[in-house]
Amino acid sequence: CVAQSVNVLNSLFLTDGEHCILTPNYDVFDMYQVHQGAYTLGFEEKNKDPEVCIFASIKNDDIYVNLVNTSYSESKKIELKFKQCPEFVEAKTLYSKDPQNYNDAKHPNRVRCKEGKAPAWEKDSFQIALPAASVSVYHFRKTETEK
């Protein structure tokens, strides 16, 4: 029921009179839809940072890597290494310079998903910089040599 999902903690959108405001939760919900119908992709974590959460999935030739930086104050550097190098397709990142920011009727787009930066390629891995308090989805695609 839509009525139960509006104006409550962790709702996808809020109403304020005539206004319907998408929340950051909506953006996360939208970003994570790429995992529907996909298979979990196993991975090995080296030098695990307890403030970074990682999960990945694969659907056909598309690989999706989600990175969540739970630190309110520190950006994080992540190295992604694949057995066979896929091509980078796109990245989406949800963050705000102030983790306390929220969307309201006066500022409906203060915290919204943005196009993320392409990861740098160094040696044999992708180098990713995660903003503080951010959620990111990186989309890669298997290359012809991997199929």
Which role does the model predict for each range below?
Residues C1-D30, V34-A56:
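Aromatic/acidic polysaccharide-binding cleft in carbohydrate-active enzymes
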Residues S11, Y39-G42, N66, E74-E79, ...:
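Extended hydrophobic-aromatic, low-complexity segments
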Residues G42, K48, K59, E74, ...:
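Ser/Thr- and Asn-enriched, surface-exposed coil loops between beta-strands
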Residues P50-C85, A91-L94, A133-H139:
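Carbohydrate-binding surface patches
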Residues C85-L130:
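Acidic, Ser/Thr/Pro-rich beta/coil linker or hinge segments at domain junctions
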Residues E122-K147:
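Beta-strand-rich recognition/accessory modules
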